[in-house]
Amino acid sequence: MTQNTQGPNKNTGESDLMEQIVNLCKRRGLVFASSDIYGGFRSTWDFGPVGVLLKRNVKEAWFKSMVQMRDNVVGIDASILMAPQVWEASGHLAGFTDPLVECSICHQRYREDQLPVEDGNIIAPMCPQQKKKQCVLGEAKNFNLMFKTFVGPVEDSANVAYFRPETAQGIFVNFVNVLNTTRQKPPFGIAQVGKSFRNEITPGNFIFRTREFEQMEMEFFVPPEQGPEWYEYWKNERMDWFYNLGMKKENIMLRPHDEDELSHYSTGTSDIEYLFPWGWGELEGIAQRTDFDLKAHSQHSGQDLSYFDPQANQRYVP
């Protein structure tokens, strides 16, 4: 899911508020800095005795609402490590990148698309090694966000694997398995909750947008002509879920993506955003992905990922 969030506001009052929140979370046992006795580790956090219960309650409330209370959604728990071909088919190996720029003086790195722009020109941040001067930014380079590792004792290209950057692909590659072992038929959904990993250039604020995080994801497979109808349905369902969770309406909004923001697989995407101390940031993305994913995996794997509707006497890719 594409995240489009405002950068942190450096207003002193908001910075103080964030510091108070972080300190409160530590005192109350909600969240601790990871590896705290060693000075912490950038953008990693541990959930304490109270925090882990709170997080568990949220996950269970989501799973109950999305799976257990519905007849047309089932759950799975896919592996974090998957065959590299999965990421080739999904486009992550070639295209899961952010534009990276680096200051030639202080060597700080920034996401180019998150820097402010004025009259078509990027406004460079202030350089910590130059008094009252801006950073000298080089040309943007594409930086792949996936964490690479090796499976087995030999570190060579034949043993390369990746920590999954999203939970969606584990759902798509199990489409036929779920179809064959349940009585489900489109429209139906597959959901899972699990860890994902993204080597973010500039991690976000506190536990928002970290390199290791948990996703709650559901993919809903429908006949092609029903896509727009179900897209509207899930936008309303998901907003209601956040309201029922106790969020104030003035602090949450549904923001449709502009056409130039849409991912290559999407014909429509909306973000559910929350008003954080630093501005609006994405909590959840709802996308009409069409048949892109199943077709891509069918082409790369050589497996038939279509569905035959006996009533309509029609075969299609949901």
Model-derived segments and spans:
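TRNA-recognition modules of translation machinery and tRNA-sensing kinases, especially anticodon-binding
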Residues: 2-318
